[in-house]
Amino acid sequence: MRAVVKSVYDRVFDAKEVKGMERILVINPGSTSTKLAVFDADKELFRLSIEHDQRETAKFLRAIDQLDFRKECVLNALKEHDIPLESLSCIVSRGGMLPPCQTGAYDVNADMLRFVNSDHLVKEHISNVGCAVAHAIAEPLNIPALIYDTVSVDELIPEARITGVPELPKESRGHALNTRAMARKCAEEMLHKDFDKCTFIVLHLGGGVSTWLFQNGRAIDMYSDDDSGFGPERCGRLQAAPLVALCYSGKYTEAQLAKLVRGNAGLKAHLGTSDVREVERMIAGGDEHARLIFSALGYSLAKGIGDLATVVSGKVDRIILTGGAAHSKALTGNIISHVEWIAPVEVMAGEYELEALASGALRVLRGEEKPHTFVWNG
């Protein structure tokens, strides 16, 4: 069950020569990979992505069942890169699909471990195993195990939760980790201001999309990829009546329809691909239908930014476009043309989840943030 290291970045310096009390192991489990990195304070020692054979992971029924498998992969990687376990000060992992949480750090405690091992999961997702792996490695070392800005961050103001159907209140789920990290980075490095005194709208552009409104450090409102603009493979906001009719048309099972709206929708449904680069090649080849759909993608996502700007009466310090698809100048240019009248726009392309996790853990180690306590009475 040995994992294959697909890519390893050069070390910043020799890890064995660095000592201190701020060495952080970062773990980010994905469906087909485990990404990890080791930082000494804010200096990255190394990072790698361990690719997993899907035939191996398919043997596990639930995400939490992969605990020993993922732990072994991480320990082997540390050994290969000459990182002694006793040199670690903290372990931080991407958080899973927990009940609604605040932004920031949470200690991995007994309640959290009971929850991810229970039948009460909000959603079965591989990120659910991350906290358990962090705890399993940290406990014998007597060091903190944390999660940070979990997928289930929910700090919505009361008005944002209310919909026209009381049984269907709005939920907050999306790319809280990357978007909040980019907002903090923009505040500190570009505006030279305290993140907790700024207002940002951040659009994450990946396979999934989500748009976040951060005011004074809190995520007070947001759009996920099922209630705003569509994405490369997500449906976005749909009219209710036709959707209800489609549900009862007999054309789809519940599972098929769920896959349609989250995985087979958006660019993929219209053009047969969710790869923005491929769509740009189609347009360059003269495909006018692709040009229209790609234009509509930016148009629909820009509307979500405009919606959130009204919540704060247009008083926005910066709009930020981030995520892998933000590398597309055509897409970001389209969005910017619609929203730059609201506030200046920063394109911060790519995903910085490992850095965001490490930075959050470092703030905890330095006493700049206090971790929350997860409580579950199930």
What do these predicted regions represent?
Residues I24-D65, D225, G229:
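Short glycine-rich, Thr/Ser-proximal phosphate-binding strand/loop in the N-terminal lobe
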Residues A326-H327, G333, E346-G378:
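Glycine-rich phosphate-binding/hydrolytic loop that grips phosphoryl groups
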Residues N76-S89, E189-D194, G304-D317:
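Phosphate/pyrophosphate-binding loops at sites that engage ATP/ADP/AMP, CoA/4′-phosphopantetheine
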Residues L78-S127, P144, S152-G164:
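Short beta-strand-loop/turn "lid" adjacent to the catalytic site in phosphate-handling enzymes
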Residues V316-I335:
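Glycine-rich phosphate-binding loops at beta-strand->alpha-helix junctions
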Residues K259-G314:
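Adenine-nucleotide phosphate-binding core of ATP-dependent small-molecule kinases
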Residues L48-E86, M112, S118-V122:
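N-terminal phosphate-binding loop and adjacent alpha-helix
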